């Protein structure tokens, strides 16, 4: 009996090596198809992943820091069936680890005088004055929820004073409506008149917002009477629509976390002088309502401790106690009361995070603290304390590396280069795919095959040293390989493949691996 072995195997870039069953031609020319199983090992490199951190030296703020990626490796397990001569179908799973990357951070070495030294190219260190400008986080306008819109529509005005009493102005009567516009839409009701700097006019932005019944087209531009409830209702609806059209590309939790991180980064030099610990962790994207509330209370306590530490150090500074008084929105409390439904939790989370962002937007207490810190920064005693602290930190860094000469030398070189390494992500993946394969060229000793596949990839691990919620997304792959007939019914498959991910992990990274695999296949 004459045998011609037709082999096809392929693994997906993060998934499975592929194999084929034996096809046996008997004396009558009959075709015998059969199942097969395969195990293998894989390794490769990561493509498609870009750092989320921007290069601070890029004036346009568009250049990302470069990533140094690890070499992922793992194992595969697959089962398949020859469905026709030269065509095979396979189902397999693969586990892959060490999907990691580090990012280069730091562009210079800070000396004890608070200056950055850069290599001038001539072997000498050229001091560059470090810019340390204190400015509060810029306001971020968050999408207005349906509940917040309804609150805005129902915002009433004050009645006019009785006859004989001082008459109230339009701004006094509509104070609550004006405050709603500022807090929820970031729009000032009155602005300086460009034709007369000493006068103020209604913000032209409000006049350009669509008003009136939506079925009337076109709707002409009209003056705004903020005391008129009908006009006010249409204005609130228009502002709400604009807030969703121009909403940030990231979640409210991420916006809040970035604001708090920025504040902590700004106050840390002063907190170090006062001996106050500043937290270095932000909010995870999956932060619960309780975590958001706790983070806001933590921020309040840190800022108040800092203010209290310098109270009395300078005249007319750090005098007013900081009380952010963050209160969870009423609609979020109602949504939490609905139970543990995932949708209700997500809606409550977004509402609470958005409310926290609005509290920090242009917060007078935080703005005053920043002004006081600017005054403190110019104080001779504080300058000397900062220089002493920087020198001590530099000395501690040097002493820490004295235990190992090689490590010290490497640290010195890194210091000269002005670069360090921080972990960007460290992930693992489990991939399952269904694949189809076809033989391209076949002999008795080997065959060349190609394949395509699709399936799901589940990713978990750490990003920026923080555990992430498991992410599952669609993937597709292509493979090209060689199957070698090693023994009766035993084949060795050598394969290269590429896998494309259709979704991003944590809305940041698209992991598209380029892989090579070695597998042993046995035909039953």
Swiss-Prot record:
Start and end residues of each stretch annotated as Disordered: 112-132, 387-422
Natural source organism: Orientia tsutsugamushi (Rickettsia tsutsugamushi)
Name the UniProt record assigns to this protein: 56 kDa type-specific antigen
Keywords: Cell membrane, Membrane, Signal, Transmembrane, Transmembrane helix, Virulence
Residue spans of biased composition, Basic and acidic residues class: 395-405, 413-422
GO cellular component: plasma membrane
Described function: May be an adherent factor for rickettsial adsorption to the host-cell surface and a determinant of virulence of individual rickettsial strain. It is the major outer membrane protein.
Pfam families: TSA
Leader peptide range in chain numbering: 1-22
Topology term for the membrane: Multi-pass membrane protein
SUPFAM superfamilies, per database record: OMPA-like
Keyword Transmembrane applies: yes
Membrane-crossing residue ranges in chain numbering: 67-87, 472-492
Subcellular location: Cell membrane
């Amino acid at each position: 009996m004459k045998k011609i072995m037709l082999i096809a195997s392929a693994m997906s870039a993060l998934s499975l090596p592929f194999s084929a069953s034996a096809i046996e031609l008997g004396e009558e020319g009959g075709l015998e198809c059969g199942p097969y199983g395969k195990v293998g090992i894989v390794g490769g490199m990561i493509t498609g992943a870009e750092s989320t951190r921007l290069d601070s030296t890029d004036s346009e703020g568009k250049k990302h820091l470069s990533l140094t990626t690890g070499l992922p490796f793992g194992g595969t397990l697959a089962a398949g069936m020859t469905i026709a001569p030269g065509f095979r179908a396979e189902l397999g799973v693969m586990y892959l680890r060490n999907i990691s990357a580090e990012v280069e951070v730091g562009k210079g070495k800070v000396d004890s005088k608070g200056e950055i030294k850069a290599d001038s190219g001539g072997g000498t260190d050229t001091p560059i004055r470090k810019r340390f400008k204190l400015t509060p986080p810029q306001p971020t306008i968050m999408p207005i929820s349906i509940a917040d819109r309804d609150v805005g529509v129902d915002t009433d005005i004050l009645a006019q004073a009785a006859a004989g009493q001082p008459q109230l102005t339009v701004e006094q009567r509509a104070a609550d409506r004006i405050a709603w516009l500022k807090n929820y839409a970031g729009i000032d009701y009155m602005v300086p008149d460009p034709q007369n700097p000493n006068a103020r006019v209604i913000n032209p932005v409000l006049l350009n917002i669509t008003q009136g019944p939506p079925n009337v087209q076109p709707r002409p531009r009209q003056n705004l009477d903020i005391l008129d409830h009908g006009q006010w209702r249409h204005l609130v609806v228009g502002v709400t629509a604009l807030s969703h059209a121009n909403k940030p590309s990231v979640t409210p939790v991420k916006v809040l976390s970035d604001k708090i991180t920025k504040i902590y980064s700004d106050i840390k030099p002063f907190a170090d002088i006062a001996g106050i610990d500043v937290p270095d962790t932000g909010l995870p994207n999956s932060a619960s309502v309780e975590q958001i509330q706790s983070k806001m209370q933590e921020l309040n306590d840190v800022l108040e401790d800092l203010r209290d530490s310098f109270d009395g150090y300078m005249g007319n500074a750090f005098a007013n106690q900081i009380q952010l008084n963050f209160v969870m929105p009423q609609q979020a409390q109602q949504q939490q009361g609905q139970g543990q439904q995932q949708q209700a939790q997500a809606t409550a989370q977004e509402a609470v995070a958005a409310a926290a962002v609005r509290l920090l937007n242009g917060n007078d207490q935080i703005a005053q603290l920043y002004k006081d810190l600017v005054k403190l920064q110019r104080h001779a005693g504080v300058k000397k304390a900062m220089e002493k602290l920087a020198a001590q930190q530099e000395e501690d860094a040097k002493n820490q590396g004295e235990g190992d000469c090689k490590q010290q030398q490497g640290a010195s070189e890194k210091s000269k280069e002005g670069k360090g390494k921080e972990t960007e992500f460290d992930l693992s993946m489990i991939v399952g795919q269904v694949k189809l394969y076809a033989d391209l060229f076949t002999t008795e000793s080997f065959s060349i095959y190609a394949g395509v596949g699709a399936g799901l990839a589940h990713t978990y691990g750490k990003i920026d040293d923080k555990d992430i919620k498991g992410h599952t997304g669609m993937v597709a792959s292509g493979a090209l390989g060689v199957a070698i007939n090693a023994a009766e019914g035993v084949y060795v498959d050598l394969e290269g493949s590429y896998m494309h991910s259709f979704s991003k992990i944590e809305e940041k990274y698209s992991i598209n691996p380029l892989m090579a695999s070695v597998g042993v296949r046995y035909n039953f």
